[in-house]
């Protein structure tokens, strides 16, 4: 993977949750744009666990990145899902989306990020969505991102290329590889939060933990074989 392609004449904002994917994107953005040209935007959408926001804040402070927190918790009043209901049991029924899917979340995030970017003179928006190793979320697909790009350009008359989706076609193992190539695999493993249950270090049982740990194990196995 070619990950170092300095683009220091532009500014970018990373949609940042404090999870593995968005943190990897943040590190890649720093390498590509320079830390002084990067900002992070985080959304409080009514997620069931505060640890997600705490991790995002801590990482942004640790890296010296300006972080903007936007409250979109009104979503709890108009939609229901397991990510915003502490009492809900996380599950996925056959031929249905997982009940962790938040209707309209990524569309809303991109809209607010675009509004902020235009106001700050930021050219690029980076998001860690991926359609390779994902749970079937329709708003993680490349076709959706491209559609939002067109929609926002038309709505705001501002050429924001939301096409910055560096993880779109990477497996979870390849995302770990990218973190390793950036020299931050240990940091991402130690400091990011992915667990749907909000457990520090992960519950190892929820779909998100399983995908994360399976990807890490696969990458480390492949890396070990190459080093033999």
Swiss-Prot record:
It holds the Pfam family QueC. CDD domains: QueC-like. Belongs to the QueC family. It catalyses: 7-carboxy-7-deazaguanine + NH4(+) + ATP = 7-cyano-7-deazaguanine + ADP + phosphate + H2O + H(+). Binds 1 zinc ion per subunit. It is an enzyme of class 6 (ligase). ATP binds at residues 16-26. Keywords: ATP-binding, Ligase, Metal-binding, Nucleotide-binding, Queuosine biosynthesis, Zinc. Its cofactor is Zn(2+). Catalyzes the ATP-dependent conversion of 7-carboxy-7-deazaguanine (CDG) to 7-cyano-7-deazaguanine (preQ(0)). Its EC number is 6.3.4.20. Zn(2+) binds at residues 195, 203, 206, 209. The gene is queC. Pathway: Purine metabolism; 7-cyano-7-deazaguanine biosynthesis. This is 7-cyano-7-deazaguanine synthase. One of its GO terms (biological process) is queuosine biosynthetic process. GO terms for molecular function: ATP binding; ligase activity, forming carbon-nitrogen bonds; zinc ion binding.
């Amino acid at each position: 993977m070619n990950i170092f392609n300095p683009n220091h004449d532009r500014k970018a904002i990373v949609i940042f949750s404090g999870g593995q994917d968005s943190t990897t994107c943040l590190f890649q953005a720093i390498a590509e744009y320079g830390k002084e040209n990067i900002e992070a935007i985080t959304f409080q959408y009514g997620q069931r666990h505060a640890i997600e926001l705490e991790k995002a804040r801590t990482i942004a402070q640790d890296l010296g990145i300006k972080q903007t927190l936007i409250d979109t918790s009104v979503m709890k009043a108009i939609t229901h899902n397991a990510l915003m209901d502490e009492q809900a049991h996380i599950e996925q029924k056959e031929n249905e989306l997982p009940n962790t899917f938040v209707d309209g979340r990524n569309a809303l995030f991109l809209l607010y990020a675009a509004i902020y970017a235009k106001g700050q003179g930021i050219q690029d928006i980076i998001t860690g969505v991926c359609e390779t190793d994902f749970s079937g979320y329709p708003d993680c697909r490349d076709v959706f991102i491209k559609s939002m790009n067109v929609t926002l350009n038309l709505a705001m008359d501002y050429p924001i290329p939301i096409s910055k989706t560096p993880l779109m076609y990477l497996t979870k193992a390849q995302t770990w590889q990218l973190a390793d190539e950036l020299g931050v695999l240990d940091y991402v493993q130690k400091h990011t939060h992915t667990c749907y249950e909000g457990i520090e270090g992960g519950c190892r049982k929820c779909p998100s933990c399983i995908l994360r740990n399976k990807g890490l194990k696969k990458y480390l196995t492949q890396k070990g074989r190459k080093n033999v």
